[in-house]
UniProtKB/Swiss-Prot annotation:
<feature type="binding site">
    <location>
        <position position="554"/>
    </location>
    <ligand>
        <name>Mg(2+)</name>
    </ligand>
</feature>
<dbReference type="GO" id="GO:0052170">
    <property type="term" value="P:symbiont-mediated suppression of host innate immune response"/>
</dbReference>
<feature type="region of interest" description="Disordered">
    <location>
        <begin position="188"/>
        <end position="211"/>
    </location>
</feature>
<feature type="domain" description="Reverse transcriptase">
    <location>
        <begin position="359"/>
        <end position="602"/>
    </location>
</feature>
<dbReference type="GO" id="GO:0003677">
    <property type="term" value="F:DNA binding"/>
</dbReference>
<keyword id="KW-0695">RNA-directed DNA polymerase</keyword>
<feature type="binding site">
    <location>
        <position position="553"/>
    </location>
    <ligand>
        <name>Mg(2+)</name>
    </ligand>
</feature>
<dbReference type="InterPro" id="IPR037531">
    <property type="entry name" value="HBV_DPOL"/>
</dbReference>
<keyword id="KW-0808">Transferase</keyword>
<dbReference type="InterPro" id="IPR043128">
    <property type="entry name" value="Rev_trsase/Diguanyl_cyclase"/>
</dbReference>
<comment type="function">
    <text>Multifunctional enzyme that converts the viral RNA genome into dsDNA in viral cytoplasmic capsids. This enzyme displays a DNA polymerase activity that can copy either DNA or RNA templates, and a ribonuclease H (RNase H) activity that cleaves the RNA strand of RNA-DNA heteroduplexes in a partially processive 3'- to 5'-endonucleasic mode. Neo-synthesized pregenomic RNA (pgRNA) are encapsidated together with the P protein, and reverse-transcribed inside the nucleocapsid.</text>
</comment>
<keyword id="KW-0235">DNA replication</keyword>
<dbReference type="InterPro" id="IPR043502">
    <property type="entry name" value="DNA/RNA_pol_sf"/>
</dbReference>
<keyword id="KW-0479">Metal-binding</keyword>
<keyword id="KW-0239">DNA-directed DNA polymerase</keyword>
<keyword id="KW-0945">Host-virus interaction</keyword>
<keyword id="KW-0548">Nucleotidyltransferase</keyword>
Length: 845
């Protein structure tokens, strides 16, 4: 028997010296409510109302919503992103590789080509909230690092840049659903509206810049971050703090990026496209002469859109003189002090363009000049603090009445995972680089997933203590110098070494939408899981003698020998690369025979938690205070850690039930020395969860509220309970008796609760003990009418029902190892001929 009853009593310090009787007498006592209540009082488990102040920190565990202060690293490197372009004809490519796909695989791959996201309601936030002031000590530094990260993502084709209300530009290869206008034709069109000669010749883009009808209107009805031409480094100035440098515009239609002077449409642009090499000094003079003449003529009948946008000089269009972009205004102004930004701006003659343009332009649904989520930077991971990671907060979609209920998806539980992966195979794991950014998002989702920044001047002004920005003195010269300060000057000088003339580009406002799925939305994990599981399903069918399995972006391959694994690795890598999936070969890990996956070590002996988790548990117990009420939010953290390793302990989850109860009641929990000792003893010795073996069920258990019965081979047993018990409790006791009497690892029962092996709803002592006795037991469902133990449980030993031949098949969850292929054309050769490990390790269902 797996458990000595005396041992259990001693463990819980319930042993009062009396000798325990047989299990059939003792076990029902553990279901007694009175005993459970006494034990709870002894161990101080039920006392939820405490008057002492709660403890809010245990070791590294703080409450669920408390802020651990992140550390800013001025030396952070922005990671580089490969040009990820998942092939659009991914289904055809898979079919060339493996033959016809199953319905399941096709459905999953169609979900992500392209992904769609249309929430019911979207809350738009001002641009100020684009970059979160997460590091108050390093505001400027964080601003530029975040802005550089966004720029890198845009250049890698992961973001769209909003050009006008209805158009966006991006870099990288376009998908078919993005080519909505003019399919890259060379379009030359002259619009004589209001004296604006606009000529547009543009072979590369998808949306011709002077597009028909509504687009012309949108060029007049600009919003702040307008559509801009992309010829040459001096393309139109970007959404200006204060208008734009109009003379720098090319023959292209005047689609300035920003808020423009309303009169600007009267300017006749005749500069040739070679003018991009003009020095900015000349450009500035031209800009000022133009702007002075056409300063206030907003008579053209078209309303220029100025959504409520608060940059410090953005109002300059409508009140006060109009200047060029905020950064370049410092050129002409007198230095206000030795720390004036004009010293920095005068370092360079050519600061480059105010905005950057993508290789392609597309139409998008109406997108306001707002953001829907904020971004900030953190360390890439605890082991890599040299690189940064962008955190995108789209939590608005998970909150409130309008929250989106994200789709659920199956994750294999520990037992299924062990059944699947516990074998004598050699393993390696592949690292998919930037996995989320593989999955394309439909451009129609862009208005819902907007990030960006309001530009440096506004950002600094909002965070500085200077309140003059609220006095409506927008656009005046002294207002320009309000932002000068020693701290800003020193920060910018240091950043100048890193970013050079890009400081100018990054100081402009920008609005970006996602072109690939972002990590901060609950839809993304679902889509990624669908994607990788479909790909692995295809790989498993292509190589039937191997195993491929994935969880999110973690893909593992298993094969019988190391040589076989290497040839499999080459073949699978080439296949994935042909689909456009980027692997990081330097991070491929070869595990030998024990695989590290999802926090577990899985070998032929079963599964155990990885060492770092075991270490965390030891630290947790070392720091766990006794007799002090611990905040229930901290208990959530503790239970999260202990719950992960619970299946490897003797008593399992039931041992944690007192903690679960206090969390549910939102009350503090006090660990008594006894309960802490009991738990720590449980977690000091972890036992592997073994792979279930297929077999024939020979032992059956059944119970009624008053009695129990067993059928073991041709032997029948029965017994009665001292007092009637709830039916589930009685069935659980019968299963325990069957296990301890027969030692069988396979038991037939007709009770669904016993089958589920979740013993958390039983009386606490019984739950713990039953878990201990039944650890490693597999259950087979047998209908009551066919259960051979049914008669003995009702006290009838004379009647013999024939023993069933009930086969047991271990489950692998929803992972179909043997997805039946649709009929495959005969010319497809077999991949590699090896003795198939599947025939040794797994029996096909």
């Amino acid at each position: 028997m797996p458990l000595s009853y005396q041992h259990f009593l001693k463990l819980l310090l319930l042993d009062d010296g009396t000798e325990a009787g047989p299990l059939e007498e003792e076990l029902p006592r553990l279901a007694d409510a009175d005993l459970n209540r006494r034990v709870a009082e002894d161990l101080n488990l039920g006392n939820l109302n405490v008057s002492i102040p709660w403890t809010h920190k245990v070791g590294n565990f703080t409450g669920l919503y408390s802020h651990t202060v992140p550390i800013f690293n001025p030396e952070w490197q922005t990671p580089s992103f490969p040009k990820i372009h998942l092939q659009e004809d991914i289904i055809d490519r898979c079919q060339q590789f493996v033959g016809p796909l199953t319905v399941n695989e096709k459905r999953r791959l169609k979900l992500i080509m392209p992904a769609r996201f249309y929430p019911n309601s979207t809350k738009y936030l001002p641009l100020d909230k684009g970059i979160k002031p997460y590091y108050p000590e390093h505001v400027v530094n964080h601003y530029f690092q975040a802005r550089h990260y966004l720029h890198t993502l845009w250049k890698a084709g992961i973001l769209y840049k909003r050009e006008t209300t209805r158009s966006a530009s991006f870099c990288g290869s376009p998908y078919s659903w993005e080519q909505e206008l003019h399919h890259g034709r060379l379009v030359t069109k002259t619009s004589q509206r209001h004296g604006d000669k606009s000529v547009c010749s543009q072979p590369s883009g998808i949306l011709s810049r002077s597009s028909v009808g509504p687009c012309i209107r949108s060029q007049f009805k600009q919003s702040r971050l307008g559509l801009q031409p992309h010829q040459g480094p001096l393309a139109t100035s970007q959404s200006g703090r204060s208008g734009s440098i109009w003379a720098r515009v090319h023959p292209s239609t005047r689609r300035c990026s920003g808020v423009e002077p309303s009169g600007s449409r009267h300017i006749d642009y005749s500069a040739s496209s070679t003018s991009s090499c003009l020095r900015q000094s000349a450009v500035r003079k031209a800009a000022y002469s133009h702007l002075s003449t056409s300063k206030r003529q907003s008579s053209s009948g078209h309303k220029v859109e100025f959504p409520s946008f608060p940059p410090s000089s953005a109002r300059s269009q409508s009140q006060g003189p109009v200047f060029s972009c905020w950064w370049l205004q410092f050129r002409n102004s007198k230095p206000c002090s030795e720390y004036c930004l004009s010293h920095l701006v005068n370092l360079l003659e050519d600061w480059g363009p105010c905005t950057d343009h993508g290789e392609h332009h597309i139409r998008i649904p109406r997108t306001p000049a707002r953001v829907t989520g904020g971004v900030f930077l953190v360390d890439k991971n605890p082991h890599n603090t040299a690189e940064s990671r962008l955190v995108v907060d789209f939590s608005q979609f998970s909150r409130g009445i309008t929250r989106v209920s994200w789709p659920k998806f199956a994750v294999p539980n520990l037992q299924s995972l062990t059944n699947l992966l516990s074998s004598n195979l050699s393993w390696l794991s592949l690292d998919v680089s930037a996995a989320f950014y593989h999955i394309p998002l439909h451009p129609a989702a862009m208005p819902h997933l907007l990030i960006g920044s309001s530009g440096l001047s506004r950002y600094v002004a909002r965070l500085s203590s200077n309140s003059r920005i609220h006095n409506h003195q927008y656009g005046t010269l002294q207002n320009l110098h309000d932002s000068c300060s020693r701290q800003l000057y020193v920060s910018l000088m240091l950043l100048y070494k890193t970013y050079g003339r890009k400081l100018h580009l990054y100081s402009h406002p920008i609005i970006l939408g996602f072109r690939k799925i972002p990590m901060g939305v609950g839809l993304s994990p679902f889509l990624l899981a669908q994607f990788t599981s479909a790909i692995c399903s295809v790989v498993r069918r292509a190589f039937p003698h191997c195993l491929a399995f994935s969880y999110m972006d973690d893909v593992v391959l298993g094969a019988k020998t190391v040589q076989h694994l290497e040839s499999l690795y080459t073949a699978v890598t080439n296949f994935l690369l042909s689909l456009g999936i980027h692997l990081n070969p330097t991070k491929t890990k070869r595990w030998g025979y024990s695989l590290n996956f999802m926090g577990y070590i899985i070998g032929c002996w079963g599964a155990l938690p990885q060492d770092h988790i075991v270490q965390k548990i030891k630290d947790c117990f070392r720091k766990l205070p006794v007799n002090r009420p611990i905040d229930w939010k901290v208990c959530q953290r503790i239970v999260g850690l202990l719950g992960f390793a619970a299946p490897f302990t003797q008593c399992g989850y039931p041992a944690l039930m007192p903690l679960y109860a206090c969390i549910q009641a939102k009350q503090a929990f006090t660990f008594s020395p006894t309960y802490k000792a009991f738990l720590s003893k449980q977690y000091m010795n972890l036992y592997p969860v073994a792979r279930q073996r297929p077999g024939l069920c020979q032992v059956f258990a059944d119970a009624t509220p008053t009695g129990w019965g067993l059928a073991m081979g041709h032997q029948r047993m029965r017994g009665t309970f001292v007092a009637p018990l709830p039916i589930h409790t009685a069935e659980l006791l019968a299963a325990c008796f069957a296990r301890s009497r027969s030692g069988a690892k396979l038991i037939g029962t007709d009770n669904s609760v016993v089958l589920s092996r979740k013993y958390t709803s039983f009386p606490w002592l019984l739950g713990c003990t039953a878990n201990w006795i039944l650890r490693g037991t597999s259950f087979v469902y047998v209908p009551s009418a066919l259960n051979p133990a049914d008669d003995p449980s009702r006290g009838r030993l004379g009647l013999y029902r024939p023993l069933l031949r009930l086969p047991f098949r271990p489950t692998t969850g929803r992972t179909s190892l043997y997805a039946v292929s649709p009929s495959v054309p005969s010319h497809l050769p077999d991949r590699v001929h090896f003795a198939s490990p599947l025939h040794v390790a797994w029996r096909p269902p």
